[in-house]
């Protein structure tokens, strides 16, 4: 899941992955940098979790938030070794990843931290905890995922807010009526693209 999440953000050009959790270590599952050099920490939770995940990711943010550029550069070097990536100093790799005209200065790295918890869309306790800390001003967010079984294969999706809290979409059914289909079968798609829910006209 960490691989897929990292690939999702990298494809969008939003983040640069610099670290992935080592087995049996008290570490975030994934660390990345944004365009401004700020650190983004991901904690992935499978199914509904027991305990306080938000406090756990705060501990990670406290620990990693104190790391210097040189600490991050060392972590990135180990990440490159592990995944057989070309060796490059972090600030130069960051410049290339985001297409910057010049590399950031050392002091511009890790000035701010953002915590992201990735969890099941049905875990209402976790969603509530994240919403609470966000309301207190913490830079924390929740990314929901949902797992599907199609045939003999499992699929999962990450999706954006607003999101529902049901494990399976079939638990909440909806019906779309296209009363204009006989006149213009493509008009419904134009309405979707324009965020139009209802269109009325005189007969």
Name the predicted role of every residue range.
Residues 1-203:
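Charged, terminal alpha-helix-loop-beta segments
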